[in-house]
Amino acid sequence: MYPTIEDIRKIAAKGQYKRVPVCREVYADRYTPVEAIRTLRKASRHCYLLESASQTEVWGRYSFLGYEPTMEITCTDGLMKIRHTEVADKEETVKKVMHPGDTLREILREYKSPVIEEMPPFTGGLVGYFSYDYIKYSEPKLKLGEHEDPDFRDMDLMLFDQVIAFDHYRQKVLLITGVMLEDLEASYQKAEKKLQEMADLIRNGEKEEFPPLELESEIKPQFPKEKYCEMVEKAKHYIHEGDIFQVVLSNPMRAKAEGSLFDTYRVLRATNPSPYMFYFSSDDIELAGASPETLVKLEGKKLTTFPLAGTRPRGKTKQEDRELEEGLLKDEKELAEHNMLVDLGRNDIGRISKIGTVEVEKYMSIEHFSQVMHIGSTVAGELREDKDAIDAVDAILPAGTLSGAPKFRACQIIEELEQSKRGIYGGAIGYLDFAGNLDTCIAIRLVYKKKGEICIRSGAGIVADSVPEKEFEECCNKARAVVLAIENAQEGLE
């Protein structure tokens, strides 16, 4: 187990931290993240799996898993609930807040941890989602209406003091937990015991038999083609009137369903490898997805966002792919949309960055995914001293690629035209760690299951010369990878 207790005493002497992560390594040649999450799900209803692959389909170095959170923190319409899951009677704190961020900061301060160079980038923190509707806290003047699912949470985060990280480069499983510095000797012994329990669980734990997903109705869009095209025309009217330059209109696809989304996740990770792949399970909801797009990333003081805008389906051959790429980079409508969203990304990053540090590090490259290709850029800045990871979420959520420009007015028009609570779609999924870092993706290319219904939501960016029928088809293209994963999962996996 490392660091040693002597090393931790040296860290404690600095007086900056409340917790230090410790790690034990075991060989991973007998285990996979998919097998491990089955074991963790059997041990705890609350669990997650975060994985990554690049656009070239090379797997990222780490897969992160967690189970048995210390607490679950939710907020819905300003009502914040903190449930201490380790307490026998699961005591719950309920309070009304103007913004959940202050409470999140208090919780994170109690676990403040250093970055240990030998360890992976995530060694404990808050994992979960901020919904699209979380914007009500950073933009209180934006009035979001009551819709068909008023109990959909604005935020659902779980605090994980223990992390299981698969290091795919070294073929090791890293078992990580925290040593609290207040009672160092006892906490160190407790951590040794916890790491042994984690090792035993991974090696010998019972595995969950996830029930297969069974659709009880056809997957259908909420807005038929004719209705969606009407919405596009109304959005174009606002553009011509000068209210906005661009707006993203989404179209949910729903079906009644029973069973688990776990096999859908397995298909997605195999057929649609993406920078952000996630499986998330709680008492309230089950999520599976493969998002291509970062919302915001904070490492130390460096902030990064990666706007993706401009879409084409993948070609059947390399030559067809190249032709589609060339056409995409010559499409004035797509280029105009992308440039607007790069400018919006610079503006969002600039709100919390030091003056003069915001720059476009990469501009208009083609990013390939299993079903579609996008134009991508990278915008970065240096975080101001008076700002933190929660400020970063406030500044950038929802992404311009899922709302529009100007963002505030675009969100008002979305509220008027969509007439439904977006929920997770267009929000953020990822982690805020105990060292102050943040890594979140935009909540797209996902399916969630709640109250016996699955939902897949996708959108299209509407600009002045948008063709309504093409925008409807773009929504369908973006949803296609998830729909195919559901269909393939139903056929049965070994």
Q: PLM features: residue spans?
A:
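Extended alpha-helical targeting/anchoring segments
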Residues: 1-494
